[in-house]
Amino acid sequence: MFKKLHMKIAVFVSIMLIITVVLLMLSSYLTLKPMITEDGKNTTQNVTQSLEQNIELQLKSYAISLSRLANGELTHTFVTKPSKEASRLFHDDIKQIKDNDDYVAMAYIGTAKKEMFTYPKADFAEDYDPTSRPWYKLAAETPDQVVWTEPYKDVVTGDMIVTASKAILDRQKVIGVASYDLKLSAIQSMVNKQKVPYKGFAFLADASGNLLAHPSNQGKNISKDQTLQTIASEKKGIQDVNGKMVVYQTIGETGWKVGTQFDTDQLMWISDKMNRANLWISLIALIITIILSYFLAKTITGPIQQLIVKTKAVSAGDLTVRAESKSKDEVGILTRDFNLMVENMKEMVEQVRLSSGKVSDTSEQLTAVAAETNETSGQIAKAIEEVAAGASEQASEVETINEKSESLSTKIRQIAEEAGGIKERSKSSEDASYKGLDALGQLLMKSNEANMETKKVETMLLDLENQTKNIEEVVTAISNISDQTNLLALNASIEAARAGESGRGFAVVADEVRKLAEQSALSTKHISETVKLIQLETKEASHAMVEASRMNDEQNSAIHETGEVLNTITAEMQSLVQGIDHIYAEIQRMSEEQLAISEAIQSISAISQESAAAAEEVNASTDEQLVTLDKVKHSTETLKHASQELMNTIAKFTL
């Protein structure tokens, strides 16, 4: 299954995506937790700060009101110059303060003279000394500031009360202290109603560690808790208390601590919820991506698989195949170049097949002509041998006549008989000469035809050699394309290796392209070797045809010379026959003209010797011609064999 390129791409993309998802989930988990923790801290800090500002703002409003009362002219006049009018105005003032704010439990003044004035009116013991009370002492110690006492529970109402005090000064001398008893219920309600995220809550504690506001432990003192002691000693901060995140801040000069608390597990619950949501989203995206990558890989590798099938068909010799691709990427370019290569190969093989057919036909014709020429030359050689034999015999007889010319008178009858024999043999020689001329004419005609066919074959071989050179150039171009494709695939593999894991899919595609280029290179090499073999055999055949042409030229020259000799022999034989006839007619006068006869016989002897020599030369030329014809025949057979092998090679291709 993993031998398929599209499966490799799909599996590779899936593995990379799984690794990416795992890394993203791990990164999300590792980064989300501190981010959520930090966000929780920031949120609760903002809540705590807002709560602290609201409480401080409320306390400050009471401090401003109390400062106005303590520093007011009415209060100063009431304390330093008491009168009914001053008392009335002062009481109206504090009454208005009390009536306008339900959280002011009581407004009052204690003087240095140990007098006590309150609203609402309250009864005090006769020995009650306001200057001995904590609220008075604190204000007297810091006359320029509003001071706050520790909160306490009202014994009558049960409400938590805090007293704010401000010294009344006269020439920088404390003459009294103005105070408000404030109900903390408003602040407690504000704290208890404060919404804190992550299922948290707000709390308020005084400087002694008493919880003024808390959803479950209100009124409890937590000053003995070591962790909370750290909170009490610092102005503000964040503490992790038993898995609870506590954010706290000090309120102004009161020393109170307002804070918020939430469970850190709630932060992790949100983180886990987000991680689970991310996990499901990642799984769905992973499945969709795997499916899409599978079909994308099929889309990419489909044209390559088609091209592999077409390449195998071409390597098997089928040049009718064509690959289809409408894309304009590298695969599309490779497909179009493949189709162009197959088309060019088809045209070249077709041309080679046609040329091979012509060469084969011409070779057969040349073989037939060579066979006929060889047979005719054999007949000529036989005739020339007969002529040579007759000429030799004639020379011998003439020599005998010459030797016995002295006894011609006594052997006239024998001379007459011999003359008759000479006449008959002369006729035979004349007939043989005419036959030799006819045979020589046939030989010349066949030799010319053979020469013409040889020229045609030589021309065709040159054309074939040029065609094979064209094939070799195209094959070289194809080989260069394969080498370039292989080099590009190698470069793509190097670039993919540089890209690391993200480039591994491109490395696999590049490796497949490189293998395809190597297969094309092997096929091209096989074609190149076949073409080189054809070129070698064509060159050998061409050289043989050139040699045959040269031999034909020499043969034609020898035939012309033989024809001239035969014409001479024929003419001489005609003269010889006429002479013999004359001898035969004048035999009765031979004795009277013996000297003339002797001279004539010597002349005949010389001519006979020349005829014998010419016949031997013709015979030798004929033998050479036979050898040449054998070579021509052998060359044509070699050419025919090479043409047949070429046809068999071309037959492997389907056009």
UniProtKB/Swiss-Prot annotation:
Can you supply one Gene Ontology CC term for this chain's record? membrane raft
Q: Which UniProt keywords apply?
A: Cell membrane, Chemotaxis, Membrane, Methylation, Transducer, Transmembrane, Transmembrane helix
- Domain HAMP positions: 298-350
**Positions on the Cytoplasmic side per record topology:** 1-8, 298-655
Q: Where in the cell is it found?
A: Cell membrane; Membrane raft
Describe how it is modified after translation.
Some glutamine residues are deamidated to glutamate by CheD and subsequently methylated.
Top-level taxonomic group = Bacteria
Q: Which CDD domains match?
A: HAMP (cd06225), MCP_signal (cd11386), PDC1_MCP_like (cd12913), PDC2_MCP_like (cd12912)
Matches recorded under Pfam families: dCache_1 (PF02743), HAMP (PF00672), MCPsignal (PF00015)
Segments forming domain Cache: 148-225
Induction (UniProt): Induced by SigD. Expression increases in the late-exponential growth-phase and is maximal during the early-stationary phase.
Task: Please give a single GO biological process term from the UniProt record.
Answer: signal transduction
Sequence similarity: Belongs to the methyl-accepting chemotaxis (MCP) protein family.
Official protein name in the record: Methyl-accepting chemotaxis protein McpC
**Per UniProt, what is the name of the gene that codes for the protein in this document?**
mcpC
